[in-house]
Amino acid sequence: MYGIIEDANLTLEGINSSSLLTSGGSEQKTMERYKGETLALSAMIYFDLVRFFGDVPLKLEPSQADLSNAYLHKTDRDVILDTLMVDLKNAVELLPWADEVSGYTTEHATKGYAHALLANIAMTRAGWVIREQAKDGYETANYTDPTYPTQRPDAATRTKLYELALSHLSAIITNGTHKLNPSVENQWYLINQRELDKNYHENIFEMPMGLGVSSELGYTVGVRVNGATTEYGVKGNSSGKMKLTAPFFYSFDKKDLRRDITCAQVQLGAENGVTKESMLGNAPFGIYVGKWDVRKMNEEWR
Protein backbone atom coordinates (compact mmCIF):
# COMPACT_ATOMS: atom_id res chain seq x y z
CA MET A 1 0.00 0.00 0.00
CA TYR A 2 2.88 2.34 0.66
CA GLY A 3 4.13 1.50 -2.83
CA ILE A 4 0.91 3.00 -4.20
CA ILE A 5 1.37 6.05 -1.97
CA GLU A 6 4.94 6.46 -3.22
CA ASP A 7 3.68 6.36 -6.82
CA ALA A 8 1.01 8.92 -5.93
CA ASN A 9 3.56 11.24 -4.33
CA LEU A 10 5.79 11.00 -7.40
CA THR A 11 2.82 11.72 -9.64
CA LEU A 12 1.78 14.76 -7.61
CA GLU A 13 5.33 16.10 -7.61
CA GLY A 14 5.47 15.78 -11.38
CA ILE A 15 2.07 17.39 -11.93
CA ASN A 16 2.71 20.28 -9.54
CA SER A 17 6.02 21.07 -11.24
CA SER A 18 4.56 20.87 -14.75
CA SER A 19 3.83 24.05 -16.69
CA LEU A 20 0.79 22.29 -18.16
CA LEU A 21 -1.01 22.69 -14.83
CA THR A 22 -1.26 26.43 -15.46
CA SER A 23 -1.20 26.47 -19.26
CA GLY A 24 -4.93 27.00 -19.68
CA GLY A 25 -7.25 25.16 -22.04
CA SER A 26 -7.71 21.43 -22.39
CA GLU A 27 -4.17 20.54 -21.30
CA GLN A 28 -4.67 22.23 -17.94
CA LYS A 29 -8.03 20.49 -17.47
CA THR A 30 -6.40 17.14 -18.18
CA MET A 31 -3.63 17.79 -15.65
CA GLU A 32 -6.17 18.88 -13.07
CA ARG A 33 -8.04 15.62 -13.56
CA TYR A 34 -4.81 13.68 -13.12
CA LYS A 35 -4.09 15.58 -9.93
CA GLY A 36 -7.61 15.09 -8.60
CA GLU A 37 -7.53 11.36 -9.32
CA THR A 38 -4.16 11.01 -7.63
CA LEU A 39 -5.33 12.85 -4.51
CA ALA A 40 -8.45 10.69 -4.34
CA LEU A 41 -6.63 7.38 -4.82
CA SER A 42 -3.96 8.31 -2.28
CA ALA A 43 -6.71 9.21 0.21
CA MET A 44 -8.45 5.89 -0.46
CA ILE A 45 -5.27 3.95 0.35
CA TYR A 46 -4.46 5.97 3.46
CA PHE A 47 -8.03 5.57 4.69
CA ASP A 48 -7.70 1.79 4.40
CA LEU A 49 -4.35 1.90 6.22
CA VAL A 50 -5.90 3.85 9.10
CA ARG A 51 -8.87 1.50 9.31
CA PHE A 52 -6.59 -1.54 9.33
CA PHE A 53 -3.79 -0.31 11.58
CA GLY A 54 -4.75 2.97 13.27
CA ASP A 55 -1.80 5.34 13.61
CA VAL A 56 0.59 4.90 10.66
CA PRO A 57 3.37 6.97 9.04
CA LEU A 58 2.02 9.84 6.95
CA LYS A 59 4.26 10.35 3.94
CA LEU A 60 3.35 13.24 1.66
CA GLU A 61 6.42 13.48 -0.55
CA PRO A 62 8.49 11.05 -2.65
CA SER A 63 11.41 9.27 -1.02
CA GLN A 64 14.77 10.98 -1.38
CA ALA A 65 17.69 9.15 -2.96
CA ASP A 66 19.47 8.97 0.42
CA LEU A 67 16.27 7.64 2.07
CA SER A 68 16.43 10.47 4.59
CA ASN A 69 12.62 10.73 4.58
CA ALA A 70 11.82 7.06 4.09
CA TYR A 71 11.69 5.94 7.72
CA LEU A 72 9.03 7.95 9.51
CA HIS A 73 7.36 7.68 12.90
CA LYS A 74 3.65 7.06 13.20
CA THR A 75 1.22 9.95 12.81
CA ASP A 76 -1.95 10.21 14.89
CA ARG A 77 -4.86 8.80 12.91
CA ASP A 78 -6.92 11.97 13.41
CA VAL A 79 -4.18 14.08 11.84
CA ILE A 80 -4.11 11.69 8.87
CA LEU A 81 -7.89 11.78 8.38
CA ASP A 82 -7.95 15.57 8.67
CA THR A 83 -5.22 15.76 6.01
CA LEU A 84 -7.16 13.42 3.71
CA MET A 85 -10.29 15.53 3.99
CA VAL A 86 -8.36 18.63 2.94
CA ASP A 87 -6.91 16.74 -0.03
CA LEU A 88 -10.35 15.50 -1.05
CA LYS A 89 -11.84 18.99 -0.89
CA ASN A 90 -9.17 19.91 -3.42
CA ALA A 91 -9.95 16.82 -5.50
CA VAL A 92 -13.66 17.71 -5.58
CA GLU A 93 -12.79 21.00 -7.26
CA LEU A 94 -10.52 19.35 -9.82
CA LEU A 95 -12.51 16.30 -10.89
CA PRO A 96 -15.48 15.99 -13.29
CA TRP A 97 -18.60 13.96 -12.62
CA ALA A 98 -18.83 10.54 -14.25
CA ASP A 99 -19.37 10.83 -18.02
CA GLU A 100 -19.20 14.64 -17.82
CA VAL A 101 -16.07 14.28 -19.94
CA SER A 102 -16.03 11.80 -22.83
CA GLY A 103 -14.64 8.45 -21.71
CA TYR A 104 -14.41 9.52 -18.06
CA THR A 105 -16.39 6.69 -16.51
CA THR A 106 -16.81 5.38 -12.97
CA GLU A 107 -13.63 3.37 -13.55
CA HIS A 108 -11.93 6.68 -12.75
CA ALA A 109 -12.01 8.50 -9.43
CA THR A 110 -14.64 11.16 -10.16
CA LYS A 111 -16.08 14.17 -8.37
CA GLY A 112 -18.82 11.91 -7.03
CA TYR A 113 -16.28 9.49 -5.57
CA ALA A 114 -14.27 12.31 -3.97
CA HIS A 115 -17.47 13.63 -2.35
CA ALA A 116 -18.43 10.15 -1.12
CA LEU A 117 -14.98 9.27 0.21
CA LEU A 118 -14.72 12.57 2.06
CA ALA A 119 -18.11 11.92 3.69
CA ASN A 120 -17.03 8.40 4.65
CA ILE A 121 -13.83 9.72 6.23
CA ALA A 122 -15.72 12.45 8.10
CA MET A 123 -18.13 9.89 9.58
CA THR A 124 -15.22 7.64 10.56
CA ARG A 125 -13.36 10.58 12.11
CA ALA A 126 -16.43 11.26 14.28
CA GLY A 127 -16.76 7.66 15.47
CA TRP A 128 -15.44 5.48 18.26
CA VAL A 129 -11.95 4.07 17.90
CA ILE A 130 -9.51 2.11 20.05
CA ARG A 131 -6.50 4.36 20.68
CA GLU A 132 -2.93 3.68 21.71
CA GLN A 133 -3.34 6.23 24.49
CA ALA A 134 -6.09 8.48 25.80
CA LYS A 135 -6.53 11.92 24.21
CA ASP A 136 -7.60 14.98 26.20
CA GLY A 137 -10.97 16.44 25.29
CA TYR A 138 -12.29 13.20 23.82
CA GLU A 139 -15.20 11.13 25.14
CA THR A 140 -14.21 7.76 26.57
CA ALA A 141 -16.57 4.81 26.25
CA ASN A 142 -17.90 3.00 29.29
CA TYR A 143 -16.07 -0.17 30.33
CA THR A 144 -13.20 0.66 28.00
CA ASP A 145 -9.76 -0.90 28.27
CA PRO A 146 -7.66 1.37 30.53
CA THR A 147 -4.49 0.87 28.47
CA TYR A 148 -6.02 1.18 25.00
CA PRO A 149 -9.14 3.31 25.53
CA THR A 150 -12.03 3.55 23.12
CA GLN A 151 -12.70 7.23 22.43
CA ARG A 152 -14.45 9.60 20.07
CA PRO A 153 -14.32 13.39 19.59
CA ASP A 154 -16.42 15.76 21.70
CA ALA A 155 -20.01 16.52 20.72
CA ALA A 156 -19.25 19.84 19.01
CA THR A 157 -16.55 18.30 16.83
CA ARG A 158 -18.81 15.38 15.93
CA THR A 159 -21.57 17.75 14.88
CA LYS A 160 -19.21 19.60 12.54
CA LEU A 161 -18.05 16.32 11.02
CA TYR A 162 -21.63 15.10 10.55
CA GLU A 163 -22.53 18.38 8.84
CA LEU A 164 -19.47 18.07 6.61
CA ALA A 165 -20.46 14.54 5.60
CA LEU A 166 -24.04 15.63 4.96
CA SER A 167 -22.96 18.50 2.72
CA HIS A 168 -20.87 16.22 0.50
CA LEU A 169 -23.50 13.49 0.31
CA SER A 170 -26.13 16.11 -0.49
CA ALA A 171 -23.94 17.33 -3.35
CA ILE A 172 -24.04 13.83 -4.86
CA ILE A 173 -27.80 13.53 -4.47
CA THR A 174 -28.51 17.02 -5.78
CA ASN A 175 -26.31 16.60 -8.85
CA GLY A 176 -28.19 13.45 -9.89
CA THR A 177 -25.36 11.71 -11.75
CA HIS A 178 -25.43 8.80 -9.29
CA LYS A 179 -28.82 7.18 -8.64
CA LEU A 180 -30.06 3.81 -7.46
CA ASN A 181 -30.85 1.43 -10.29
CA PRO A 182 -34.59 0.70 -9.84
CA SER A 183 -33.91 -2.93 -10.79
CA VAL A 184 -31.53 -4.70 -8.42
CA GLU A 185 -31.61 -7.68 -10.78
CA ASN A 186 -30.40 -5.51 -13.67
CA GLN A 187 -27.73 -3.96 -11.48
CA TRP A 188 -26.17 -7.34 -10.71
CA TYR A 189 -26.66 -8.61 -14.24
CA LEU A 190 -24.56 -5.69 -15.49
CA ILE A 191 -21.89 -6.43 -12.89
CA ASN A 192 -21.77 -10.08 -13.93
CA GLN A 193 -21.54 -8.99 -17.55
CA ARG A 194 -18.68 -6.62 -16.68
CA GLU A 195 -20.72 -3.86 -18.27
CA LEU A 196 -20.58 -0.33 -16.87
CA ASP A 197 -23.94 1.15 -15.90
CA LYS A 198 -24.14 4.32 -18.01
CA ASN A 199 -27.72 5.15 -16.97
CA TYR A 200 -27.68 5.26 -13.18
CA HIS A 201 -23.99 5.12 -12.15
CA GLU A 202 -25.09 3.43 -8.92
CA ASN A 203 -21.56 2.18 -8.29
CA ILE A 204 -19.74 5.45 -7.65
CA PHE A 205 -16.30 3.94 -8.25
CA GLU A 206 -15.48 0.61 -9.91
CA MET A 207 -11.87 -0.45 -9.64
CA PRO A 208 -10.95 -2.35 -12.82
CA MET A 209 -9.34 -5.75 -12.45
CA GLY A 210 -5.85 -6.34 -13.77
CA LEU A 211 -5.33 -7.74 -17.25
CA GLY A 212 -5.92 -11.48 -17.28
CA VAL A 213 -7.07 -11.41 -13.65
CA SER A 214 -10.66 -11.86 -12.50
CA SER A 215 -10.04 -12.28 -8.75
CA GLU A 216 -12.19 -14.80 -6.86
CA LEU A 217 -15.56 -13.29 -7.76
CA GLY A 218 -17.90 -16.04 -8.84
CA TYR A 219 -15.53 -18.74 -7.56
CA THR A 220 -14.99 -18.21 -3.84
CA VAL A 221 -17.91 -15.76 -3.72
CA GLY A 222 -20.91 -16.84 -5.76
CA VAL A 223 -23.34 -19.59 -6.68
CA ARG A 224 -21.77 -23.03 -6.15
CA VAL A 225 -20.97 -25.17 -9.18
CA ASN A 226 -20.48 -28.58 -7.61
CA GLY A 227 -18.34 -30.77 -9.82
CA ALA A 228 -16.57 -30.30 -13.11
CA THR A 229 -18.52 -29.00 -16.07
CA THR A 230 -17.18 -27.16 -19.08
CA GLU A 231 -20.47 -25.34 -19.58
CA TYR A 232 -19.27 -22.43 -17.45
CA GLY A 233 -15.63 -22.05 -18.37
CA VAL A 234 -12.49 -24.14 -18.59
CA LYS A 235 -12.13 -24.82 -14.86
CA GLY A 236 -15.75 -25.86 -14.71
CA ASN A 237 -16.55 -25.39 -11.04
CA SER A 238 -16.78 -22.84 -8.25
CA SER A 239 -16.27 -23.38 -4.55
CA GLY A 240 -18.78 -20.93 -3.12
CA LYS A 241 -16.80 -20.88 0.11
CA MET A 242 -18.30 -17.62 1.33
CA LYS A 243 -21.67 -18.43 2.87
CA LEU A 244 -24.71 -16.55 4.13
CA THR A 245 -26.86 -17.59 7.08
CA ALA A 246 -30.54 -18.33 7.58
CA PRO A 247 -31.05 -15.37 9.99
CA PHE A 248 -29.75 -13.08 7.24
CA PHE A 249 -32.08 -14.72 4.70
CA TYR A 250 -35.09 -14.26 6.98
CA SER A 251 -34.17 -10.64 7.67
CA PHE A 252 -35.59 -9.88 4.20
CA ASP A 253 -39.32 -9.43 3.75
CA LYS A 254 -40.66 -12.32 1.68
CA LYS A 255 -41.70 -9.82 -1.01
CA ASP A 256 -38.29 -8.15 -1.11
CA LEU A 257 -36.86 -8.79 -4.59
CA ARG A 258 -33.33 -8.43 -3.24
CA ARG A 259 -33.60 -11.61 -1.18
CA ASP A 260 -33.45 -14.23 -3.91
CA ILE A 261 -30.81 -12.29 -5.83
CA THR A 262 -28.62 -12.03 -2.73
CA CYS A 263 -29.22 -15.48 -1.27
CA ALA A 264 -28.87 -18.56 -3.49
CA GLN A 265 -30.54 -21.65 -2.02
CA VAL A 266 -29.46 -23.80 -4.94
CA GLN A 267 -26.24 -25.18 -6.33
CA LEU A 268 -25.39 -26.29 -9.84
CA GLY A 269 -24.07 -29.67 -10.85
CA ALA A 270 -23.61 -31.83 -13.93
CA GLU A 271 -25.85 -34.89 -14.21
CA ASN A 272 -25.43 -37.09 -17.29
CA GLY A 273 -23.85 -34.20 -19.11
CA VAL A 274 -26.66 -31.79 -18.21
CA THR A 275 -26.14 -28.98 -15.70
CA LYS A 276 -29.02 -28.82 -13.23
CA GLU A 277 -30.01 -26.89 -10.13
CA SER A 278 -30.48 -28.72 -6.84
CA MET A 279 -31.93 -27.27 -3.66
CA LEU A 280 -29.61 -26.99 -0.68
CA GLY A 281 -32.18 -28.31 1.77
CA ASN A 282 -31.63 -27.60 5.46
CA ALA A 283 -28.43 -25.55 5.35
CA PRO A 284 -28.90 -22.67 7.84
CA PHE A 285 -25.25 -21.65 7.63
CA GLY A 286 -24.58 -22.67 4.04
CA ILE A 287 -26.53 -20.33 1.76
CA TYR A 288 -24.49 -19.19 -1.23
CA VAL A 289 -24.01 -15.58 -2.34
CA GLY A 290 -26.30 -15.26 -5.33
CA LYS A 291 -25.16 -11.87 -6.60
CA TRP A 292 -22.19 -13.35 -8.45
CA ASP A 293 -23.74 -16.00 -10.67
CA VAL A 294 -21.67 -17.78 -13.31
CA ARG A 295 -24.79 -18.27 -15.42
CA LYS A 296 -25.07 -14.50 -15.85
CA MET A 297 -21.39 -13.87 -16.57
CA ASN A 298 -20.10 -13.17 -20.04
CA GLU A 299 -17.84 -15.68 -21.75
CA GLU A 300 -14.72 -13.59 -21.21
CA TRP A 301 -15.09 -13.72 -17.43
CA ARG A 302 -16.01 -17.40 -17.05
Describe each region flagged by the PLM:
Residues 56, 64-66, 211-212, 266:
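Solvent-exposed loop/turn segments at secondary-structure junctions
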Residues 59, 96-116, 129-227:
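Short, surface-exposed recognition loops and adjoining beta-strand edges that mediate ligand/DNA contacts
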Residues 1, 168, 178-302:
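Elongated scaffold/linker segments in the mid-to-C-terminal portions of large proteins
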Residues 50-52, 57, 121-133:
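Short coil/turn linking the two alpha-helices of tandem helical-hairpin repeats
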Residues 39, 115-121:
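TPR/Sel1-like alpha-solenoid repeat signature
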Residues 1-53, 68-104, 290-302:
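Conserved, well-structured interaction surfaces
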